[in-house]
Design a protein with these regions (language model features):
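N-terminal secretory signal peptides and thylakoid transit peptides that target proteins
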Residues: 1-18
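Conserved SAM-binding strand-loop segment of SAM-dependent methyltransferases
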Residues: 85-89
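Contiguous beta-strand/loop segments that form the cofactor/metal-binding neighborhood of enzyme cores
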Residues: 168, 180, 185-187, 194-354, ...
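Short amphipathic alpha-helix with an adjacent loop that forms part of the alpha/beta core around
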Residues: 92-99
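N-terminal Rossmann-like NAD(P) cofactor-binding module of classical short-chain dehydrogenase/reductase
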Residues: 104-105
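Residue-level detector of anion-binding/catalytic polar loops
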Residues: 63, 126, 153, 420-422
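N-terminal Rossmann-like dinucleotide-binding module
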Residues: 14-81, 160-163, 255
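Beta-strand-loop-alpha-helix segment that lines the small-molecule cofactor/substrate pocket
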Residues: 109-110, 114-162, 176
């Protein structure tokens, strides 16, 4: 597909991709592994989500290399993968193991996703990368372009994409069960890690087992802190993407699939104060999407840190049990149409018992509307990725057609948080109007310490 040369071409191209991936599997790919061959995986980042990703790799092939900046994590992983070569620096892994593996899993902190994935894909390696796909907006576009050019199989780690409950929800919206869509509300109970203005972290010399310079990678120099690594880096602008980046690739996923929610024209945020070091404790973000491929323009609202949609949005929706009380689900999404609403609770869109349509104040499980509704059923999110490497089917959350545009859209919310004002966005040019240098850095990173895409 040619590169769009102007805004009109860009919008047409985006609409065509969004409409076509679901049927045709998106970008044309090369199959480098036969159905009977074993896929050889190199796993980069092997604790946290890296633990489950490397285990999925083991279940769908052979893990031949493991990489982490933390020797303690490597020691633990070595017990599960005794024959795998171990590395601290992913660059050495890629150089030394080039001919010895076929695919990578990238489960590093957010700020290193793009540089690792880009280098691996440029070598012709298939890539499974954790969500959000990238730390900056441009990185998401670039990774999609590299994947398309190299014709490698890709998949982002938003596993709910493969869930039949989520896919049925999207199909019902596409079918028009609740009529013309008016607005969408999405929320999460995150953050579950410390983040707010003025929080101080204690710095120290890194333990000998932690290779801190490799952890910092392409970000600006920062002293080691046990309150950053592991896990709590999510709350720092320099390394993570906050509550929005951490969870919207899950909770925003079903509405994105159903409504092709890409390329908003403006984003505006209301949030607690923040200092540009850590993300705010809570926020509410308003995305405005234009008409696209027959889908009317609409408003999408995001809530985190305890903020919730208005009571009228949740009226008639099932509630969760909290001891003897019934309370609203602390994460989920509601799509509001002219005829009714679709309610999808939980993080991943897979709560079959409580997902359904609301007409007035009457809830009906979506399974009552499933007869005759067509959607592609997945063998499992990672299995889908492994099968696609062998030329069997397609990975839906691939970088060019799905994960990249989804991540771009989500990360625009952080742009509004940092800007502190309404952001007018030109997706074709990847430009935020009147952006400060700090805001522009969230669009296009300036890498440090010799790292690059």
């Amino acid at each position: 597909m040619r590169r769009p040369h102007n805004r009109r071409d860009f919008i047409k191209t985006s609409a065509a991709i969004g409409a076509g991936y679901w049927v045709a599997g998106g970008t044309s790919l090369k199959a480098s592994i036969s159905a009977n061959e074993e896929i050889r995986f190199a796993c980069i980042g092997i604790d946290g989500k890296g633990s489950s990703d490397s285990n999925d790799a083991k279940n769908n092939g052979k893990v031949v290399a493991i990489c982490d900046i933390d020797d303690g994590f490597l020691d633990k992983a070595q017990k599960a993968f005794p024959d795998a070569k171990r590395f601290n620096d992913y660059r050495k892994l890629l150089e030394e193991m080039d001919k010895s593996f076929d695919a990578v899993t990238v489960s590093t902190p957010d700020h290193m996703h793009a540089v690792v994935a880009a280098q691996a894909m440029k070598m012709g390696k298939h890539c499974f990368c954790q969500k959000p796909l990238t730390h900056s907006i441009e990185e998401a576009r670039v990774l999609g372009n590299i994947a398309r050019e190299q014709k490698v199989v890709t998949q982002m780690g938003n596993q709910g994409t493969a869930d039949s409950t989520l896919r049925l929800s999207a199909a019902l919206i596409k079918k028009g069960e609740i009529g013309k869509i008016k607005e969408v509300h999405v929320w999460t109970n995150r953050p579950v890690w410390p983040q707010s203005k003025g929080l101080q972290v204690k710095t120290a010399a890194p333990p000998a087992s932690i290779h801190w310079d490799l952890w910092v990678g392409g970000a600006k120099k920062h002293e080691y802190s046990p309150e950053i690594h592991p896990f709590k880096w999510r709350g720092f602008w320099a390394f993570g993407t906050g509550a929005l980046g951490d969870m919207a690739c899950h909770t925003f996923n079903m509405p994105f699939m159903a409504l092709n929610l890409r390329n908003p024209t403006s984003v505006e945020a209301v949030c607690d104060e923040h200092d540009g070091v850590m993300y705010p404790k809570s926020s509410q973000i308003h995305f405005v999407f234009p008409d696209l491929d027959g889908r009317p323009g609409l408003n999408v609202y995001w809530y985190d840190g305890g903020r919730m949609p208005p009571a009228e949005v949740l009226a008639g929706c099932p509630k969760a049990k909290n001891g003897d009380r019934e309370v609203p689900f602390n994460s989920g999404s509601v799509i509001v149409g002219e005829k009714g609403k679709l309610f999808s609770p939980g993080d991943y869109g897979g709560d079959a018992a409580n997902t359904g349509l609301v007409f007035g104040n009457e809830f009906k499980n979506q399974r009552e509307y499933a007869r005759g509704v067509e959607y592609v059923r997945s063998p499992g999110h990672f299995v889908e990725f492994a099968n696609a490497i062998k030329g069997e089917g397609a990975a839906v959350s691939n970088f060019p057609d799905y994960a990249g545009p989804l991540s771009e859209t989500i990360l625009l919310g952080n742009l509004a948080l940092l800007a502190g004002k309404k952001v007018e966005w030109d997706a074709s040019m990847m430009v935020a109007k009147d952006a400060s240098p700090e805001v522009a850095e969230l669009v296009r990173h300036q890498y440090q310490n010799g790292y690059s895409l």
